[in-house]
Swiss-Prot record:
Protein name per Swiss-Prot or TrEMBL: HTH-type transcriptional regulator AscG
Ranges annotated as spanning the membrane: none
One Pfam family it belongs to: LacI
Domain of life per record: Bacteria
Residue ranges the UniProt entry marks as DNA-binding: 4-23
């Protein structure tokens, strides 16, 4: 690998001169600049990004930590798309770090981005507790924002969706449409989002005077296959239901396929709704009713807050978003 010293020898200048040319700091004649750039091109030299970052006041980068167990869903591809696009609009490069499979690995991913001198960092945590995240924020000077988790101490550093209330509202709409027997497919139960959506389902039943039937709850893993498996589990139990709520659209699509294969008509016999309102939802047959989570607005808010902090702005109150049920063909009133 070519070094800066080798570039300097090729250009016939000092190493310090090469450094000034590449950093743009200090006066260097145009003739000398041309010789240095020619030497760089001929030698294939690439500056050490980490070394440059160590001395720079700003790297024009934003970091994002997401655990790889969340990569498979369409929801997260849309999240990453919006994060990269909005970072670009702010003149920043988005750097992604993998939180992998544990709180310790999420912590290591955050430290990796800090070591790269990212100007600010976003975290979409799966394993770190809110107390651990608060401690991380307190320990570092770079702005750190948390997506989809409500913090206790550093509440202004969180942008989140109230999944419990959003789930409550969606289930309440089903009840108000006449549904009394409502099945629920959870996501992975190590996910705070899944726990909150299940809690919202239970609260909606309780508030409307409907007894909780555990036979109507099946655990999934966010995937279409687990949605189909959840339906098979419900039917094998002999569960009777006129509506089914899946904790994301991937599972809802798998559930509709399983119902179709079992000869259960959607929505005539069972109405189905999901969460996230992914791009394919209007194009399934029947078109999937889904709770739209305002991902674009959440990303816009979190990046806006990070840039505001970098510009010296004072902290703002926490920002809470809520979802909205988009009714399509998969949802009708139950047949009498």
């Amino acid at each position: 690998m070519t070094t800066m010293l080798e570039v300097a020898k090729r250009a016939g200048v000092s190493k310090a001169t090469v450094s000034r040319v590449l950093s743009g700091n200090g006066y260097v004649s145009q003739e000398t600049k041309d010789r240095v750039f020619q030497a760089v091109e001929e030698s294939g030299y690439r500056p050490n990004l980490l070394a440059r970052n160590l001395s720079a006041k700003s790297t024009q980068t934003l970091g994002l930590v997401v655990t790889n167990t969340l990569y498979h869903g369409i929801y997260f591809s849309e999240l990453l798309f919006h994060a990269a696009r909005m970072a670009e609009e702010k003149g920043r490069q988005l750097l992604l770090a993998d939180g992998k499979h544990s709180a310790e690995e999420e912590r290591q991913a955050i430290q990796y981005l800090l070591d790269l001198r990212c100007d600010a960092i976003m975290i979409y945590p799966r394993f770190l507790s809110v107390d651990e995240i608060d401690d991380i924020i307190d320990a570092h000077s770079q702005p750190i924002m948390v997506l989809n988790r409500r913090l206790r101490k550093n509440s202004s550093h969180s942008v989140w969706c109230d999944h419990k209330q959003t789930s409550f509202n969606a289930v309440a709409e089903l009840i108000n449409a006449g549904h009394q027997e409502i099945a629920f497919l959870t996501g992975s139960m190590d996910s705070p989002t899944s726990i909150e959506r299940l809690a919202g389902y239970k609260d909606a039943l309780a508030q409307h005077g409907i007894a909780l039937n555990e036979k109507l709850i099946a655990n999934g893993k966010w995937t279409p296959a687990s949605g189909a498996e959840g339906v098979e589990m419900l039917l094998e139990r002999g569960a009777k239901f006129s509506a089914l709520v899946a904790s994301n659209d991937d599972m809802a699509i798998g559930a509709m396929k399983a119902l179709h294969e079992r000869g259960v008509a959607v929505p005539e016999q069972v109405s189905v709704i999901g969460f996230d309102d992914i791009a394919i939802a209007p194009y399934t047959v029947p078109a999937l009713s889904s709770v739209k989570i305002p991902v674009t607005e959440m990303i816009q808010e979190i990046i806006g807050r990070l840039i505001f902090m970098l510009d010296g702005g004072d902290f703002s109150p926490p920002k809470t978003f809520s979802g909205k049920l988009i009714r399509r063909d998969s949802l009708i009133a139950p047949s009498r």
